[in-house]
Amino acid sequence: QMVKSVYETKKRFDFIDMNFIGSIQARNDKIAGKLFDIYMTEYQRLNPKWSREELKPFVDKLVKEHIDKIKPASNTMAQSVFVEHPTDGLSLAASYVGGISINENYGSDYKSFTEIKENEVRIGHKPVGCGNVKATIDHELGHQIANKLNACNDTEIVEKYNRFSGLSDIEQANTLSTYAAKNIGEFVAECWSEYSNNPQCRNVAAFVSKRLIDLYEAEEIGPKILERGFSR
């Protein structure tokens, strides 16, 4: 399902650059390796008389402090990483593993993962048609698309989100999902997830997703989209 999700999205948005697809834990290991190289180089520059072995404990400690900050929470099932302009060591290291990741604590048990997502759909926490692994990946890809297009600052999408966030929980569930009200980034990602998985996609998800397509076509940052809407 992960391959299917990425393939369909790449077919629509060719600019999506997936440097990493895998578990959050494996991604963090790669970030740790990059961080070590970055900070070791800097420490050696600042302390030319110190050997690599002498500096290693200090670098290891700094790397651990950074990695501890990005460990997935117990309820985190998936994450998206997108760093276009690194501003520090951590974001520079993360820029090498831009893409999507699944928490291996959930991804290692497909049946349990699916049951959790189906229940989230049932209670309105997630959109209709999104009770599966593919929809979770599509949600994370929605973040990638939105970040690349700066969609969260688009006037039409902001207006749609502001109206949505003013709805009651029940109205939000019937319109899209309650999770979509968390912030505009999650709102856009939830819209893309439903658009990619619900053959009877509802109005808000359809509007926002088609707006993403319009923004992409206007940017001319890649081949034009050949198809719209739900596809199997």
Question: Predicted regions span which residues?
Answer:
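Active-site-flanking segments in enzyme catalytic domains
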Residues: 1-231
